[in-house]
């Protein structure tokens, strides 16, 4: 009997971030595809370039460096992401890494502030 789409979605929804990362890698190897986000090219604007441009609405919080107090940084990462202890530790140990992606400016700034208060070096992109 074949697995239904709903069963697959339920299984993926219950996976940890590390398991999802392994799943993506397996898909890339099995099907020869890349999970990298594709750049979307918008229509060219009329006239010269708009020097100001549109304000960025989605941000990525990057952990640049864990700093001296790794335990506090791991706790902050767990609080920000909801990851388990092992996943958060692996993420901190693997810095520089993105912590949160595609979030609004307020959420990104709050996450950056928590990381910096814990002793980490973080940046917004």
UniProtKB/Swiss-Prot annotation:
Q: Per UniProt, what is one GO molecular function of this protein?
A: structural constituent of ribosome
Q: Which GO terms describe its cellular component?
A: cytosolic large ribosomal subunit
* Pfam families per UniProt: Ribosomal_L12, Ribosomal_L12_N
The protein's matches in InterPro entries, at most eight in alphabetical order, are given as: Ribosomal_bL12, Ribosomal_bL12_C, Ribosomal_bL12_C/ClpS-like, Ribosomal_bL12_oligo, Ribosomal_bL12_oligo_N_sf
Tell me the GO BP annotations in alphabetical order. translation
Could you tell me the keywords of this UniProt record? Ribonucleoprotein, Ribosomal protein
Q: Where does the source fall among the domains of life?
A: Bacteria
Cite the record's note on assembly. Homodimer. Part of the ribosomal stalk of the 50S ribosomal subunit. Forms a multimeric L10(L12)X complex, where L10 forms an elongated spine to which 2 to 4 L12 dimers bind in a sequential fashion. Binds GTP-bound translation factors.
Its family? Answer: Belongs to the bacterial ribosomal protein bL12 family.
Q: What PANTHER family does the record point to? A: 39S RIBOSOMAL PROTEIN L12 (PTHR45987), LARGE RIBOSOMAL SUBUNIT PROTEIN BL12M (PTHR45987:SF4)
Designated name of the protein = Large ribosomal subunit protein bL12
Species this protein is from? Polynucleobacter necessarius subsp. necessarius (strain STIR1)
Gene designation per UniProt: rplL
């Amino acid at each position: 009997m074949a697995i239904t789409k709903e069963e697959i979605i339920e299984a993926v929804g219950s996976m940890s971030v590390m398991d999802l990362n392994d799943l993506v890698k397996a898909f890339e190897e099995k099907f020869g595809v890349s999970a990298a986000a594709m750049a979307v090219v918008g229509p060219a604007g009329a006239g010269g370039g708009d020097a100001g441009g549109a304000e960025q609405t989605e941000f990525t919080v990057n952990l640049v460096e864990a700093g001296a107090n790794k335990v506090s940084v791991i706790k902050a990462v767990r609080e920000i992401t909801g990851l388990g202890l092992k996943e958060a530790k692996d993420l901190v140990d693997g810095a520089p890494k993105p912590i949160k992606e595609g979030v609004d400016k307020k959420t990104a700034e709050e996450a950056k502030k928590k990381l910096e208060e814990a002793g980490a070096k973080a940046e917004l992109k």
